Amino acid sequence: MAIEEMLEILRTEDPKLSKLNEKYAVKENINGKTLMEIDRGAADFFGILNTGVHLNGITNDHENKKMWVATRSHQRKTFPGELDNMVAGGQPSNITRQENVVKECFEEASIPEELAKASEPRGFVSYNMQAGTTLRRKILYVYDLYLPSSFIPVPNDN
């Protein structure tokens, strides 16, 4: 039985196992080759290491630095209504991290592509966390983006 067929059966039995229509790469380790792909909504269910990008939006008006902070949608399954980076998203298997930063910047804050490309990688945060009956294993790659002081982020997705 193919993994997608198995997931469809599991979804009928467990409503928390969502389908997000975004493929994550399944690897033996972070630098390993892709063994298979799985829907992002199933990654935690199987304890699969997944990655994402988080971007700090910073303005500097020569007097003091300020950082934009987002509030997560109340409809999100994870951490609804909580504070978050200005831009954050899971890492699909079919694009690079930099391409994902540009995509997420546009979707979550209406940041133009040329401005988003100026983002600078700063490091990563990794964690493992039990969430109910699942294991959330994450590596979040952190970026900084200096924005014009006049810039106001506007969500461009749902």
Give the residues covered by each predicted segment.
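N-terminal leader/linker segments that precede catalytic domains of diphosphate-processing enzymes
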Residues: M1-E82, G90-E107, I111-V154
